From Swiss-Prot:
Family per record: Belongs to the class I-like SAM-binding methyltransferase superfamily. rRNA adenine N(6)-methyltransferase family. RsmA subfamily.
The species this protein was found in: Burkholderia thailandensis (strain ATCC 700388 / DSM 13276 / CCUG 48851 / CIP 106301 / E264)
UniProt lineage: Bacteria, Pseudomonadati, Pseudomonadota, Betaproteobacteria, Burkholderiales
Keyword Transcription regulation attached: no
Reactions accelerated catalytically: adenosine(1518)/adenosine(1519) in 16S rRNA + 4 S-adenosyl-L-methionine = N(6)-dimethyladenosine(1518)/N(6)-dimethyladenosine(1519) in 16S rRNA + 4 S-adenosyl-L-homocysteine + 4 H(+)
Name listed for the protein in its UniProt record: Ribosomal RNA small subunit methyltransferase A
Alphabetic keyword roster: Cytoplasm, Methyltransferase, RNA-binding, rRNA processing, S-adenosyl-L-methionine, Transferase
Amino acid sequence: MSNSRQHQGHFARKRFGQNFLVDHGVIDAIVAAIRPERGERMVEIGPGLGALTGPVIARLATPDSPLHAVELDRDLIGRLKQRFGELLELHEGDALAFDFGSLALPGEKPSLRIIGNLPYNISSPLLFHLMSFAPVVIDQHFMLQNEVVERMVAEPGTKAFSRLSVMLQYRYVMDKLIDVPPESFQPPPKVDSAIVRMIPHAPHELPAVDPAVLGEVVTAAFSQRRKMLRNTLGGYRDLVDFDALGFDLARRAEDVGVDEYVRVAQAACAARAGR
């Protein structure tokens, strides 16, 4: 595969993190994993040159129920409009600032499916941005840097287990589906990639905790990975009775599971509410 940044007459822009998927076998495998169906409400983040967009539209879109897409590159928007017409409704702008909830169908049930080959330079911030729309989302299928996917699905007690692992596992059930080598892209990235499926937990499955406080606790815990939690979570001792929780502070952040972090955040919330 050529290392040229040009593909189909378009120069991939580094500032947009553009690497275009060109391997038809991988594209077919991704579409098979997504299983788009006619009439579903689906949005693609960063459709690029339409490698995934085309096969998805063929299975899903009608003029009355188009595929939605969020794209920042104006040059690509013109090409996509010309190619797909009324079967693709484009939203020009930055996915990090886009209100995905605005695309959900009316009603209480989740209705939105989100897909995309996410720009690797903004993948973590974008995943956190999308968390706020989880109540209206059926599922998400993303191409990401393999290292990020490994962190997303990592188990406690492993080096890959991180703040990203805790926060996303709190909100989603996640599975790594497909490994994708660099040569599947033009230009090839310098890293391996993978497809991940993310399904939000149902409301009744979510622990009753303020996500902001959970994020605060987890961020503190992972702020100095090599230090014991007695140091990184020491500031919470006036709020949380760690002994009563059965929470051992003589551990490092990566050794603590999601449920334990939730209990600490719940205790911190309760203590603050009682003051």
